[in-house]
A protein has these predicted regions:
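Active-site beta-loop-alpha junctions enriched in small/polar residues
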Residues: 1, 30-32, 58-63, 96-98, ...
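Short amphipathic alpha-helical segments at helix-loop
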Residues: 26, 64, 108-112, 140, ...
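Hydrophobic transmembrane alpha-helix bundles
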Residues: 29, 33-34, 65-78, 91-101, ...
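Short secondary-structure boundary/hinge segments and terminal tails
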Residues: 37-38, 63-65, 101-102, 149-150, ...
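N-terminal pre-domain/capping segments
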Residues: 1-90, 114, 118, 125-126, ...
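Active-site acidic/histidine proton-transfer and metal-coordination neighborhood
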Residues: 68-169
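Hydrophobic faces of well-ordered beta-strands that scaffold small-molecule active sites
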Residues: 27-29, 53-58, 91-93, 139-141, ...
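Histidine-acidic metal/acid-base catalytic patches
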Residues: 4-5, 9-23, 47, 87, ...
Length: 283
């Protein structure tokens, strides 16, 4: 889900029903306000379906430095509080987009200056410290298409600049492939930084068109660039094997970006994907 309320995506009650029906047990909160924000009601709605929450999600523009801290913390703190109330231990941090995901309008330069990189690292460490101290949560930063933490080079630069004790990575296999990355190589190189997984695939033929035509991420999703496993890349078996060799317990949340999304479309895909992942050894 991309938005708290949008007629072109599945309603929250149907979402919860179908997640459970497809055989999954864990969900993320998604955009704040999509699921109920009252902790007791949220616990009731998830509990009666046998679901649990693994993480909340926040959106940040920390490369802008201290000037955006107060607004960022106001956004983060209420989501962190709800996340803690669910019993989850992780907060997924998505960097701000340099290009609007709907219109494709360029919002700022796609390349950060050296000063902006320093602020991004410094303020993300601050966020990790504050979220950990105040809410007992671990932040996992999510490299994402059309953000400044996207390509293998930018992901490596970000990881090299941040404290492993404060900042981990949410490796989204689809976004990383979309931006030219190899998930297995990243796991093998920065294994100690991988704190969370999003399992996803991209359609290589659609991706080639997207790159050639410089299509923004939102319209690329509408074209079907994110596809149902095992039809796309990366192959998930080697990714899961590499993650297994780390010897740590990781959440692996299954996703397929679909927007706009006909309401009848997700459930059959979710069922087939769950069966496929079981065949890969994922319980």
């Amino acid at each position: 889900m991309w938005f708290p309320d949008d007629p072109r995506q599945t309603g929250w009650e149907r979402f919860l029903d179908e997640v459970a029906e497809a055989g999954y047990e864990w969900i993320e909160l998604g955009p704040y306000g999509y699921l109920p924000t009252d902790p007791e009601r949220l616990a009731d709605e998830t509990g009666k379906r046998g679901l649990r929450v693994s993480a909340g999600t926040v959106f940040t523009g920390l490369h802008h430095g201290p000037a955006v801290w107060d607004g960022t913390w106001e956004h983060v703190s209420r989501i962190a509080a709800l996340t803690r109330a669910t019993g989850a231990r992780h907060l997924v941090v998505i960097p701000s987009f340099w290009r609007d995901d709907k219109s494709g309008a360029v919002l700022e330069d796609s390349v950060l200056t050296a000063d902006q990189w320093r602020e991004l690292a410094r303020q993300t460490e601050r966020l990790g410290r504050e979220v950990g101290d105040r809410y007992g949560l671990r932040i996992v930063v999510h490299p994402h298409a059309d953000t400044h933490i996207d390509t293998p080079e930018n992901v490596a630069r970000f990881l090299d600049a941040t404290d492993p004790d404060l900042v981990s990575l949410c490796l989204d296999t689809g976004h990383y492939a979309y931006c030219g990355g190899d998930s297995v190589e990243l796991i093998e190189t920065y294994g100690e930084r991988i704190g969370y997984l999003h399992l996803k695939q991209v359609d290589p033929a659609v991706l080639a068109e997207v790159r050639e035509q410089r299509v923004p991420f939102g319209p690329a999703v509408a074209r079907g660039v994110m596809c149902e496993p095992p039809r796309g890349v990366p192959a998930l078996e080697p990714v899961l094997e590499a993650a297994g060799r780390l010897g740590t317990e990781l959440f692996a949340i299954v996703e397929q970006d679909m927007y706009p999304c006909p309401p009848e479309q997700p459930l059959p895909i979710a069922r087939r994907t769950r069966a496929y992942l079981r065949s890969c050894g994922l319980r």
